[in-house]
């Protein structure tokens, strides 16, 4: 369920702070969100794939921790990211 290099580059160019940014919180959350969406689609078709379901839960937890960090340190960046990713509807 890994992201292709082209998809990663597209996400990082949109959400990164600069062209080669991979470590900013926004970039990490955007990449995790795309992986979560892909895994969710996979699990809709393969309902009994419990190994991937555990991986999904770990990714969701990691994204939750990063969002909590961002909300605590910079609320404006947090709200902007949530709106751009379409989370918290």
From Swiss-Prot:
CDD domains: Ribosomal_S15p_S13e (cd00353). GO terms for molecular function: rRNA binding; structural constituent of ribosome. One of its GO terms (biological process) is translation. GO terms for cellular component: cytosolic small ribosomal subunit. Keywords: Ribonucleoprotein, Ribosomal protein, RNA-binding, rRNA-binding. Pfam families: Ribosomal_S15. It comes from the Bacteria. Gene3D superfamilies: 6.10.250.3130, S15/NS1, RNA-binding. The keyword rRNA-binding applies. Part of the 30S ribosomal subunit. Forms a bridge to the 50S subunit in the 70S ribosome, contacting the 23S rRNA. One of the primary rRNA binding proteins, it binds directly to 16S rRNA where it helps nucleate assembly of the platform of the 30S subunit by binding and bridging several RNA helices of the 16S rRNA. Forms an intersubunit bridge (bridge B4) with the 23S rRNA of the 50S subunit in the ribosome. Belongs to the universal ribosomal protein uS15 family. NCBIfam families: S15_bact. This is Small ribosomal subunit protein uS15. It comes from Corynebacterium kroppenstedtii (strain DSM 44385 / JCM 11950 / CIP 105744 / CCUG 35717). The gene is rpsO.
